[in-house]
């Protein structure tokens, strides 16, 4: 393999690696956005749960069924 052929091979590999790195970066950025949305949704669900527990009491405070 000549030096020129090796250089072409290395440049070709680098081009493919650059494309792969960019694609992976795009995925990581999108996953970050998804995580941010999920964290907001989770915070909202926790808030709603705490409000419901405050209104209706916790599950442990439930009266026993009438047959006891």
Swiss-Prot record:
**Coiled coil: which residue ranges?**
none
Domain of life, per UniProt, equals Bacteria
Q: Which Pfam families match?
A: SlyX
What InterPro entries does the entry give?
SlyX (IPR007236)
State the similarity comment.
Belongs to the SlyX family.
Q: What is this protein called?
A: Protein SlyX homolog
* Species this protein is from: Pseudomonas putida (strain GB-1)
